[in-house]
């Protein structure tokens, strides 16, 4: 007889159930045996193809509630009920994922080692530097928009939350450059930052920069 539950040695009243034991308790079929890395690849293909999205296989959290209301309990009850309700869903999801795997295969056949090296360089060197220097890029762009110049903040200015200085007509304007997420999370931002706020938000292929606070200041002092 298979031991389904094993007591933990360090504390009474606590047990552990392995995933294999769980499948046996619920009388589920054995976990499918797949080649190495296959599960991860199939899952990735599913993400890209959206094979198991609700529009294809149904909203599972709601379906299981609906199933329980029928009085069904066993896996076979669930399987029969689901396949009657969505007779083509498994095949449709399989087809979507399989097609995406074939797309992966075609791409892999075209890839060369140098392509992988370029990807690694882009991640480790370029994107890391880009993330660190994003504030400088924003500072430069905003200064250009305002017809002025800029300089990086000093160590003392940085300690006050100043990320850079915009220079217009020899007048220095300290600014704080923060992400929209950061601004939304900070309750007392105006009390902590000494510079005029520039807010940025990263989108898929661009960065949205809101310097309206600074623009109002510049226009009102002309």
Curated annotation (Swiss-Prot):
It is an enzyme of class 3 (hydrolase). One of its GO terms (biological process) is DNA restriction-modification system. Its EC number is 3.1.21.4. It catalyses: Endonucleolytic cleavage of DNA to give specific double-stranded fragments with terminal 5'-phosphates. InterPro entries: Restrct_endonuc_II_MjaI (IPR019068). Keywords: DNA-binding, Endonuclease, Hydrolase, Nuclease, Restriction system. The keyword Hydrolase applies. It holds the Pfam family RE_MjaI. GO terms for molecular function: DNA binding; type II site-specific deoxyribonuclease activity. A P subtype restriction enzyme that recognizes the double-stranded sequence 5'-CTAG-3'; the cleavage site is unknown. This is Type II restriction enzyme MjaI.
């Amino acid at each position: 007889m298979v031991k389904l539950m094993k007591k933990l040695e360090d504390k009474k009243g606590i047990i552990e159930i392995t995933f294999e034991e769980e499948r046996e308790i619920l009388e589920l079929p054995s976990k499918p045996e797949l080649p190495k890395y296959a599960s991860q690849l199939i899952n990735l293909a599913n993400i890209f193809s959206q094979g198991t999205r609700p529009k294809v296989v149904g909203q599972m959290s709601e379906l299981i509630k609906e199933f329980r209301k029928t009085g069904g309990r066993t896996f076979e009850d669930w399987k029969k009920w689901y396949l009657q309700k969505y007779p083509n869903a498994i095949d449709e999801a399989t087809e979507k994922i399989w097609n995406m795997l074939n797309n992966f295969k075609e791409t892999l056949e075209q890839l060369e080692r140098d392509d992988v090296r370029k990807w690694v360089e882009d991640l480790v060197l370029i994107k890391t530097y880009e993330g660190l220097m994003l504030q400088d890029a924003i500072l430069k762009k905003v200064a250009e928009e305002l017809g002025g110049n800029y300089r990086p903040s000093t160590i003392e200015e940085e300690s006050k939350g100043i990320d850079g200085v915009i220079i217009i007509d020899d007048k220095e304007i300290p600014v704080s450059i923060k992400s929209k997420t950061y601004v939304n999370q900070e309750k007392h931002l105006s009390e902590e930052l000494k510079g005029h706020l520039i807010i940025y938000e990263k989108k898929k292929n661009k960065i949205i920069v809101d310097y309206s606070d600074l623009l109002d200041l510049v226009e009102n002092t002309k």
